[in-house]
């Protein structure tokens, strides 16, 4: 079942070029507003898309739930403009498509600054609910590099311990590192105690990482690999979100090395173009340990996310 006319399977180069016009057509400020951040998850989240009234519409629902939990992303523009009447017609047509598929309509993971755009187009129609678990953490690149200030003192101590204790080599990831990278990823996963939902999410993440490795040479994709004694022990992969912001999609490190997480984060930031000033390190998904780790790095701000359901 697909809610919209097209899926993310068998996408042509023309399709990707069209999508990029929309993903790059407005500063959405969310980590999911790139082609790759959707494409690499297509095996876990069944994605469908269609251009309606000039806006790019996309639905996403877990494949193992038969898309019954599907939501619609905010309609995307390629010219930086949102016309209230066209946007209203777009959403109304999309609601009809959800209804025809037997799926309750909702707009999900809506960046906070875009809620007003939808409400202006359709006043009184939707109820907006803040979803804390989906809020994204945005950091200053220079702070992640320097770890300066009292609030980051413990992180800086961990980094300094690593630098005093170990010799390492940092270099961009390449496809021929795939075997070592996947072995490290699987090894880290084995040591975690997780509930069944987390296990499923990590299985999906593993598949997404495999997909991402095929795109390391794509423009605006950035990566770093950390080698200790010739062995790959940490890596990070991300991409550009906007002129001054990048998103880090994946970060893995062997926890046996104190300070390695701080190091790989620093090296990833140092590998970014100079004009990148902000790093979106995505959401914590409501996982307590992940939330604690992200909060401990003292984000510059949170990119809030909302769920919008029709009233009544």
Q: What are these language model-derived features?
A:
Residues 114-128, 157, 286-302:
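Conserved active-site alpha-helix within GNAT-family acetyltransferase domains
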């Amino acid at each position: 079942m697909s809610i919209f006319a097209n899926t993310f399977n068998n996408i042509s180069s023309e399709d990707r070029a069209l999508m990029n016009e929309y993903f790059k057509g407005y500063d959405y400020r969310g980590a999911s507003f790139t082609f790759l951040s959707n494409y690499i998850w297509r095996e876990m989240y069944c994605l469908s898309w269609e251009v309606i009234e000039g806006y790019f519409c996309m639905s996403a629902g877990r494949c193992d739930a038969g898309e019954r939990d599907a939501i619609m992303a905010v309609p995307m523009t390629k010219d930086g403009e949102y016309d209230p009447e066209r946007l209203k017609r777009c959403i109304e047509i999309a609601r009809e498509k959800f209804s025809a598929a037997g799926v309750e309509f909702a707009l999900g993971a809506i960046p906070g600054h875009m809620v007003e755009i939808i409400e202006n187009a359709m006043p009184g129609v939707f109820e907006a609910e803040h979803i804390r678990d989906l809020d994204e953490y945005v950091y200053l690149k220079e702070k992640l590099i320097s770890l300066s200030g009292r609030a980051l003192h413990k992180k800086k101590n961990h980094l300094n311990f690593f630098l005093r204790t170990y010799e390492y080599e940092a270099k961009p990831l390449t496809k021929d590192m795939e075997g070592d990278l996947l072995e490290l990823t699987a090894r880290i996963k084995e040591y975690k105690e997780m509930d069944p939902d987390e296990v499923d999410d990590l299985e999906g993440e593993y598949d997404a990482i495999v997909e991402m490795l095929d795109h390391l040479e794509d423009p605006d994709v950035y990566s770093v690999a950390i080698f200790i004694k010739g062995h790959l022990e940490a890596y990070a992969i991300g991409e550009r979100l906007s002129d001054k912001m990048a998103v880090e999609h994946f970060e893995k490190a062997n926890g046996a090395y104190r300070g390695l997480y701080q190091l790989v984060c620093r090296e990833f930031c140092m590998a970014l173009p100079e004009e990148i000033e902000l790093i979106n390190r995505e959401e914590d998904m409501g996982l307590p340990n992940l939330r604690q780790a992200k909060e401990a790095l003292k984000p510059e701000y949170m990119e809030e996310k909302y769920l919008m359901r029709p009233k009544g």
